[in-house]
Structures are given as structure tokens and as C-alpha cells.
């Protein structure tokens, strides 16, 4: 570029300082490690606030790292407690220069509004859609989407919540999908024969139940499932869910999938 002759440009990457990491319950070790490793490797200190429902994995990871003797004193801290109390302190404290958050959209928006000029890294949820085209390998598509719908009882940000299936294959796809769902084994996750376990607590299961009941009351069709037993909610498939229902607009975070038929994109 004219005027740039004999000039040198370069980037200098420097640690940001203290990173605040706020993690969810659904992957209590993996998602903590995802934040701790890069933060330390880049020369930062990090304060981890794990979900109050699953703090032990973060504590054990920190214990292992600190007992190794490889970390300078004080660069890794784990603080447990309510997110509304401890999380707010981390987000607002000017000494914390970056917030890394994995969790729901509403909490992410709240953090963004409070963080000021801090750097922010977020992994947020959604009511994730999958499109199945007419040339899809039917059996593979069914198997992949059943697993995507009900893995971890739907408690992950990659949960298949909305399935848009082309009209040309809709009927055979749905028949196979329902049959595979009916064969899904629900029970104790310590049993290797179990496909799907319970939700994190009964409040979460009741929330899923309420969202499904709302959709059914609004005219949705229940193809399979729709039953709660304590913290367990059966793998559930619906169609004709009205767009105004919370199930069509919000992340359900449970084992529920909605089927849609389409002809053109």
C-alpha cells in the first residue's frame, strides 16, 4: 500500500489480567477446564464460579492443579455460592478484566449489561434448529437427531429442539424418529444400558412439563412422551406447536423436540 514502504506492523498479545469464569451445571468439569486452561496458558489469573448445583468438579480440578506445584500461588481460585451474589461481584469488580460465561441467554444479557468495558466471552443457548433435506440418509439422520434431542436429557446448548423436515420425507422420517424415541431407555445413568437420565432437579423437570402443557393447551399434537416422574421427563416429540408458545421461542433445556414440515427454504 502506498505510504507503507519500509514500515513494519505487528500485534503484541498480552494477558488481560484476572479472568472471571462463570460455568453451568451440565458439563461441570469440561466447561471449567475449557476456561481454566486457555486463561492460564495466556498468562492470566482466573477466578472460577461454578454452578451452585455442581461445584465439586471445579473444586477437584483446582485441587489437582494446585497440588501439582506447577502453578504460581493465587493464579487459580474457585468460589462457590449463588450466582446472583457471587456472579454479580465478579462481573462488576473493576479488577476483573474479562468475563467468560457459558449459560442461558437471559443471564448472558444481564452480564453484558453489567460488565462495562470488560472483555466478554460468551457461549449461550438457543432453541436450536436442524434442517433435514430430502436427500438425507434417512436412518443416519434419525439416529443423529434422536441422540441430539435426548443426550443429557436435553440439558445442553446443542440440544436438537426444532426439527425442520422436508415434506418429501416427513412421514417416513417421523415414523422412524418416534420408533427410535420409544426404544430410548430412561433410568439411572450409572447403568450402562441407560440412554437418558434425569434432569438436574425437580424444578427443572417441572419447567419442562409446564412448557409442554402450555403447547398442548394451545393445540400442539403430542406424538410420544409428555410424562414427568419426579426429576425424570420422558423423551417427548410434538408437532404443530404454535409459534407463540414458549416451547417454540425459548430454550427448553429438556428432552423435548418439535417437528416441523417444510417444502421450500
Tell me the role of every PLM-derived stretch:
Residues 1-140, 262:
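Rossmann-like NAD(P) dinucleotide-binding subdomain of oxidoreductase/dehydrogenase enzymes
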Residues 67, 74, 106-242, 261-265:
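ALDH superfamily catalytic-core signature
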Residues 252:
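Cofactor-binding beta-sheet edge motifs in enzyme active sites
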Residues 255:
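Glycine-rich nucleotide-phosphate-binding loops and adjacent flexible coil segments
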Amino acid at each position: 500500500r502506498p505510504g507503507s514502504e519500509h514500515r513494519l506492523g505487528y500485534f503484541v498479545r498480552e494477558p488481560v489480567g484476572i479472568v472471571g469464569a462463570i460455568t453451568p451445571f451440565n458439563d461441570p468439569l469440561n466447561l471449567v477446564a475449557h476456561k481454566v486452561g486457555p486463561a492460564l496458558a495466556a498468562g492470566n489469573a482466573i477466578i472460577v464460579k461454578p454452578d451452585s448445583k455442581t461445584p465439586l468438579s471445579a473444586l477437584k480440578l483446582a485441587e489437582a492443579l494446585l497440588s501439582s506445584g506447577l502453578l504460581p500461588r493465587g493464579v487459580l481460585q474457585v468460589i462457590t455460592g449463588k450466582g446472583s451474589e457471587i456472579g454479580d461481584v465478579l462481573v462488576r469488580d473493576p479488577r476483573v478484566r474479562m468475563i467468560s460465561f457459558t449459560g442461558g441467554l437471559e443471564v448472558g444479557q444481564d452480564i453484558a449489561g453489567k460488565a462495562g468495558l470488560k472483555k466478554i466471552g460468551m457461549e449461550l443457548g438457543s432453541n436450536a434448529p436442524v434442517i433435514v433435506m430430502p436427500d438425507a440418509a434417512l436412518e443416519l439422520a434419525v439416529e443423529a437427531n434422536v441422540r441430539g434431542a435426548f443426550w443429557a436429557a436435553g440439558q445442553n446448548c446443542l440440544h436438537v429442539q426444532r426439527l425442520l423436515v422436508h415434506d418429501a420425507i416427513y412421514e417416513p422420517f417421523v415414523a422412524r424418529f418416534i420408533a427410535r424415541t420409544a426404544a430410548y431407555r430412561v433410568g439411572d445413568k450409572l447403568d450402562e444400558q441407560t440412554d437418558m437420565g434425569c434432569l438436574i432437579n425437580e424444578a427443572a423437570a417441572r419447567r419442562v412439563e409446564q412448557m409442554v402443557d402450555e403447547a398442548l393447551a394451545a393445540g400442539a399434537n403430542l406424538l410420544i412422551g409428555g410424562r414427568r416422574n419426579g426429576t425424570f421427563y420422558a423423551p417427548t416429540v410434538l408437532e404443530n406447536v404454535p409459534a407463540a408458545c414458549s416451547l417454540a421461542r425459548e430454550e427448553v433445556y429438556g428432552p423435548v423436540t418439535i417437528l416441523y414440515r417444510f417444502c421450500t427454504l
